[in-house]
């Protein structure tokens, strides 16, 4: 494994969370690790050209929601704010049954996740 990135502490300006997102945590982490530490403008541009269509709309909606909740008087230019922290936690699994050969049944686990995003300066 590579070296752990050292996180820089930013003052939290706004925080948002989406729960029970019907995307596996592993797929969501690929995107969130990519945009962590970027400015809001860079993150939106990166999400626009990312070839991972399953998680992009949900992460983009969350990012725009957090940007909308920023106090405009204290921070008039929201494009320069930095994504300071992003967590993706596993959510509950929906278990489904798929019929298989010789009367067997296989389990299908439909995974979900919770995503938390913080914007700082």
Where are these regions (language model features)?
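Structured, basic alpha/beta domains of bacterial-type, RNA-associated proteins
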Residues: 2-23, 29-30, 34, 38-121
């Amino acid at each position: 494994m590579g070296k752990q990135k050292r996180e820089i502490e930013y003052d939290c300006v706004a925080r948002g969370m989406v729960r029970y997102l019907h995307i596996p945590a592993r797929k969501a982490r690929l995107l969130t690790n990519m945009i962590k530490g970027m400015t809001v403008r860079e993150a939106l541009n990166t999400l626009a050209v990312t070839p991972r269509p399953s998680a992009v709309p949900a992460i983009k909606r969350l990012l725009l929601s957090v940007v909308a909740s920023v106090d405009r008087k204290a921070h008039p230019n929201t494009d320069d704010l930095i994504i300071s922290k992003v967590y993706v936690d596993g959510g509950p699994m929906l278990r489904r049954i798929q019929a298989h050969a010789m009367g067997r049944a296989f389990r299908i686990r439909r995974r979900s996740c919770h995503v938390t995003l913080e914007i700082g300066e």
